[in-house]
Each structure stands twice: as structure tokens, then as C-alpha cells.
């Protein structure tokens, strides 16, 4: 609720007024959406713990009791999850029903009444989508309770499932029941969204629709907006990440006894091979999951966009449900499926091996890839593929000469999104990692649980920095490929013309 309200308020201000800190707010929102919650939560632990940055350097004695309480955790989650509402609602507000707004004002409506009776009702789908995104991501979040478990015990369903698996004796029955409850809650939230929206129409794109252009605010309001935007970007990003950087250079578990040292980085990178080994495992799993997920996701998106398959609507709904399933529930499901004696008798030994992490990561990546590719394919008319088919082009030629050239940027975005999400998927890796096999996210999480703050902070900065550099490098290397032979490079390079020339030349 609070995350939706906060994100909606910022989105409306961002669309209505033009201020310099708006771009900074956009960047912070996208970084928060990509960055795993357990890394943000660890930063808040380093900042607000009893011997953290806030108390030791700023003299805020009561900060620990405020942050590590139910209201404090709600505050942290709002700061971490509001970008879902901000980005969703901001996208919906980019077009304005100007004709309807003028009609309301002519009939005596004030600016507030015009927003309440015209703009807000038309954005109900965006508000509902934002609310359910925040709700599903929060209720299934395993990273935050895992990250703060060393300093504060806050029981959530995902963490209770994790504890059931690592209790003595192992309670598979309890883990299964709690996972079922969690899925039921998520399904109930999705049903509630459909009931609120019903069969009403919310489309308003016509000749009276114009793109919203931010106005220049009054001087005092502009200063206030810039200060607010800069402060929010600092609070949401610089506080947790900056605290992690500070702790990574500390020679003590307490910032109060801070002494600058590079020993943490030396131990992580040079003396201990665990980080590099975990990073190698995570990169391999993420690459395999992204490639396999991209192949399967491309096929699913093609079926949903261009085929007459009778059950494609069912596939679309299932992909949305799969997108909502938390990683810890997915991991439990894979344990129940693959930890069967008859499967071992068939020679399909998956449980207790890295292969099961790859399978679970593929399952988690496919819904994300499918949504990204489906949005890209929706812009390519089916008539183009139908015309190529009439000229004798087979499926592989249509994909190779039409879809791939036009979807280069979308494919790269889908691959990198799946790759980054798989590297930092703490829930799946924690539940399914085999004995004597570590991954980057598990390695970092274990360090925090063991109160090795400086060591785990250095591992976070080093490992996360390497992953970010690899993603940026991949983006730079594929930038030329995304532009090469694109439809903007002349009519002779357009996919439909290349196809026609190829058919004429045999």
C-alpha cells in the first residue's frame, strides 16, 4: 500500500513537472529494480546496526531500534520496492486524454477534480499492476529476512520455508504446506486484481490524446523538487551501497573501531579461492539459464504473438503465474519433483547436483524473457511474416531474416535481464545448492550470517562489481550487432527486402 502510494506520487510529480533531479530519480529507480534485495538489505545492516555507520559516525543512537523493527522494515521495503509503482505508473501517465480533460475543466472541474474523475480512473490498470507487483515481490522476498537474520529475527513465509529445510529433522511437510499457502496468497492477489478491473475498458488512445509534456515549475517548487529527488536517490542508493563500501575497508566488525585496511579484499580475492569459485559457478549457471531460457522464451513468445494455437491464452496466463512464484517456492518444488527414488532409477540424477540449479534458474528466467520478447514482437505486424510465408519462406527463414534483425535490442535486453537475475538469485541458490558447491549469492549471504561483515562487504563489492562490468561489457560488444543491418540502415537492408532478394536469387 505505502509503496504504491509513494511510487504513484513520485510518478505524477515526475510527469507533471520538469526538474533536474528527475533523471537522477529515474536512474535510481531502475538500479533498485535490478539490484537484489539482499544486497540493499545488507547495506542497511551496515548502516543501522548497533555498531554501524549511523551510530558510530553520525551519533544516531536510536537508529538501530527504529530500523530493525516492523515499521522500520516496512520503511526499508517501501524504499526498495517503490520503483515498481514508479516505473509502471509513470509509463501509463506519458499519454494524456486532453479532450476529456478539457471537457472536465469547461464544466467547472478544478485541477484536482479533473485528475480524480478523468486521469486517475483511466490509470486503474497501472495502479493495480503496480500494487500487485509490489505485493508479490515483497511477500516472496527471501533476501531481506536472510540478510538481517544476523542482527534481527523477522519471520516471513519464505524464511520459514528455508528454516523448515534446514531444521533438524528436516521438515519437508512443513516446507510444502507453507509454500502452498504462499502460492495461494499470490493467486488470491491476482484474482482480486482481475475482480477490481472486471471487463471495463480503459483504452483512451484517439485523436484527442496527446503526449504529456512536463511543465517548468515555479522557482520555489523547482528547488523543493530537486532537493527531494536528490535526497531520495541518496537515501535509496547511496546509504546502503555507501555503507557497504565503508564496511569493506574496515578492519573491525564495528565501524566504531574503524581502521582502514585492504585485508578484506586481499582475503576475498587473493588468499581465498571461494569467491572466485562461487563467481565462476554463478556465471556458468546464469549463462546456461539465460541461453536455454532465451531459446524456450523465444518459441513461447512466437506462439503467443503469431500462431492460432487455441491454448495460447492459457500459456500467457501460466507465464504470468510463473513470474509471480517466489524463488524459494520454486526451489521447494524442484526438491519434491527430483528427489524421487524412481527418477534416480531412471538415471536422471538431478537433486544434489548443479544441474538442478540450472533447471530452476531456467524456469525462473523464462517468464521474464517471455514478457520482454512478447512486448518486442507485439510491435512487428504479423502481415510481414505472412507475406514472407506466401513467397515461400519457411519458419527458420522468417525468423532469421525478419524477427531476429528487428528484435536484436530486445533479445539482448532479455538475455542480460535473465543473466543478471540468475547470478543474484539468492532463494534458488540457497535452497538447491549441493554440498561443497558454492555460488556468489550464497557465499555473500553466509558471510553476513556469520557476522563477517567486512569480509562479506568486500565480497559483495568485488563480486557484484565483476558481474556489473561483465554485463556492461556484453552490452557494449552487442551494441554494434544490434545496429548492424537494422531497418534504419537503408531500404536494401530492410528484412523484408533482404528476404525478397534472397528468394529471387534462389
PLM segments and residue spans:
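Glycine/proline-centered hinge or cleavage motifs at structural transition points of membrane proteins
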Residues: 107-108, 121, 391-393, 405
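Transmembrane helix boundary and interhelical loop/hinge segments in multi-pass membrane proteins
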Residues: 88-100, 111, 124, 157, ...
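Transmembrane alpha-helical segments of polytopic membrane transport and secretion proteins
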Residues: 112, 194-232, 473-506
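Membrane-water interface segments at the C-terminal ends of transmembrane alpha-helices
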Residues: 1-94, 122-142, 147-149, 177-194, ...
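Glycine-rich helix-loop "coupling/hinge" segments at transmembrane-helix boundaries
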Residues: 143-169, 254-258, 425-453, 488
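Short amphipathic alpha-helical coupling elements at transmembrane boundaries
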Residues: 26-29, 98-106, 117, 160-167, ...
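Juxtamembrane inter-helical linkers in multi-pass membrane proteins
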Residues: 102, 110-113, 201-217, 253-268
Amino acid at each position: 500500500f505505502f509503496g504504491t502510494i509513494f511510487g504513484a506520487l513520485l510518478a505524477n510529480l515526475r510527469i507533471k513537472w520538469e526538474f533536474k533531479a528527475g533523471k537522477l530519480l529515474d536512474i535510481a529507480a531502475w538500479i533498485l529494480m535490478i539490484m537484489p534485495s539482499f544486497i540493499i538489505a545488507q547495506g542497511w545492516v551496515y548502516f543501522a546496526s548497533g555498531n554501524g555507520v549511523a551510530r558510530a559516525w553520525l551519533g544516531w543512537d536510536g537508529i538501530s531500534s527504529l530500523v530493525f523493527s516492523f515499521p522500520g522494515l516496512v520503511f526499508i521495503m517501501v524504499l526498495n520496492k517503490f520503483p515498481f509503482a514508479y516505473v509502471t505508473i509513470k509509463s501509463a501517465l506519458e499519454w494524456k486524454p486532453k479532450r476529456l480533460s478539457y471537457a472536465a475543466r469547461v464544466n467547472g472541474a478544478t485541477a484536482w477534480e479533473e485528475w480524480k474523475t478523468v486521469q486517475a480512473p483511466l490509470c486503474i490498470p497501472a495502479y493495480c499492476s503496480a500494487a500487485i507487483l509490489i505485493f508479490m515481490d515483497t511477500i516472496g522476498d527471501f533476501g531481506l529476512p536472510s540478510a538481517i537474520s544476523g542482527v534481527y529475527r523477522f519471520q516471513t513465509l519464505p524464511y520459514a520455508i528455508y528454516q523448515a529445510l534446514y531444521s533438524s529433522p528436516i521438515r519437508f511437510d512443513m516446507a510444502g504446506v507453507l509454500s502452498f499457502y504462499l502460492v495461494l496468497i499470490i493467486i488470491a492477489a491476482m484474482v482480486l486484481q482481475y475482480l477490481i478491473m472486471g471487463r471495463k475498458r480503459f483504452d483512451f488512445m484517439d485523436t484527442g490524446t496527446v503526449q504529456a509534456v512536463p511543465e517548468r515549475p515555479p522557482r520555489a517548487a523547482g528547488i523543493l523538487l530537486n532537493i527531494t529527488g536528490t535526497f531520495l536517490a541518496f537515501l535509496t542508493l547511496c546509504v546502503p551501497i555507501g555503507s557497504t563500501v565503508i564496511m569493506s575497508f574496515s578492519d573491525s566488525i564495528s565501524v566504531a573501531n574503524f581502521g582502514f585496511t585492504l585485508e578484506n579484499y586481499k582475503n576475498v580475492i587473493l588468499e581465498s579461492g571461494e569467491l572466485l569459485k562461487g563467481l565462476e559457478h554463478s556465471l556458468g549457471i546464469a549463462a546456461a539459464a539465460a541461453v536455454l531460457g532465451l531459446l524456450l522464451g523465444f518459441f513461447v513468445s512466437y506462439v503467443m504473438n503469431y500462431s492460432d494455437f487455441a491454448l495460447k491464452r492459457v500459456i500467457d496466463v501460466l507465464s504470468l503465474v510463473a513470474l509471480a512464484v517466489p524463488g524459494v517456492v520454486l526451489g521447494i518444488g524442484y526438491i519434491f519433483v527430483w528427489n524421487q527414488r524412481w527418477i534416480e532409477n531412471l538415471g536422471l540424477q538431478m537433486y544434489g547436483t548443479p544441474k538442478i540449479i540450472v533447471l530452476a534458474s531456467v524456469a525462473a528466467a523464462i517468464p521474464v524473457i517471455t514478457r520482454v520478447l512478447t512486448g518486442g514482437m507485439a510491435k512487428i505486424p504479423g502481415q510481414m511474416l505472412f507475406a514472407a510465408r506466401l513467397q515461400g519462406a519457411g519458419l527458420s527463414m522468417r525468423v532469421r531474416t525478419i524477427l531476429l534483425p528487428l528484435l536484436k535490442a530486445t533479445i539482448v535486453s532479455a538475455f542480460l535481464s535473465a543473466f543478471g537475475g540468475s547470478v543474484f538469485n539468492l532463494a534458488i541458490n540457497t535452497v538447491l545448492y549441493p554440498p561443497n558447491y558454492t555460488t556468489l549469492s550464497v557465499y555473500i549471504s553466509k558471510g553476513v550470517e556469520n557476522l563477517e561483515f567486512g569480509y562479506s562487504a568486500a565480497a559483495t563489492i568485488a563480486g557484484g562489481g565483476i558481474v556489473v562490468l561483465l554485463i556492461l561489457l556484453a552490452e557494449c560488444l552487442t551494441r554494434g550487432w544490434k545496429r548492424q543491418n537494422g531497418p534504419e540502415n537503408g531500404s536494401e537492408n530492410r528484412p523484408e527486402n533482404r528476404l525478397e532478394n534472397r528468394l529471387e536469387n534462389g
